[in-house]
């Protein structure tokens, strides 16, 4: 299956009949459909990390982060949540790059975020980013040993 696709890939936002706002001319809308894991497992053992960012030309020596925020909003009368991302400036460490590391190449620069969101296969995760932004996400799961693992996935624009 291609990256970003899942067993829930046959779903569309129209299946939910909820009036999610259309993206503005300055936005992209990403919709994430999650595979069912069972109610208790979804509630206790799975979380979703949203990783918004932007592709920027950066060197290979420094660590870069994008500033910004993720605002949670609710569709009035429905109770369904969606998220609006604001991206601001990029910051990085100040190491002197040498050799190939000095070459600036396009790379995804992620926004700093610590939030984990509920895994709910019954509803899509709808995220609006700036037009020049991208969205990636990770599914975090708990193993019986108590340690967590994550799988990184590119979100699909819809």
From Swiss-Prot:
SUPFAM superfamilies in alphabetical order: Ecotin, trypsin inhibitor
Stated name of the protein: Ecotin-like protein 2
Pfam families named among the record's database cross-references: Ecotin
Record GO terms (molecular function): serine-type endopeptidase inhibitor activity
Superkingdom, taxonomy of origin: Eukaryota
UniProt similarity note: Belongs to the protease inhibitor I11 (ecotin) family.
PANTHER family: ECOTIN (PTHR35890:SF3), PTHR35890
Originating organism: Leishmania infantum
């Amino acid at each position: 299956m291609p990256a970003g696709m899942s067993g829930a890939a046959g779903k569309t936002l129209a299946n939910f009949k909820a009036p999610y706002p259309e993206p503005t001319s300055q936005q992209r809308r990403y919709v994430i459909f999650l595979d069912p894991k069972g109610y208790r497992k979804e509630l206790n053992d799975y979380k979703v990390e949203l990783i918004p960012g932007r592709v920027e030309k950066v060197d290979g020596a420094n660590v870069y982060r994008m500033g910004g925020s993720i605002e949670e909003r609710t569709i009035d009368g429905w109770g369904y949540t969606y998220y609006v991302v604001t991206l601001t400036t990029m910051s990085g460490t100040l190491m002197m790059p040498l050799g190939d590391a000095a070459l600036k190449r396009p790379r995804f620069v992620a926004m700093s975020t610590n939030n984990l969101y509920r895994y709910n296969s019954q509803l899509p995760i709808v995220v609006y980013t700036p037009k020049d932004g991208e969205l990636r996400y990770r599914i975090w799961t708990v193993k019986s040993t108590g340690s967590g693992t994550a799988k990184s996935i590119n979100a699909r624009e819809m």
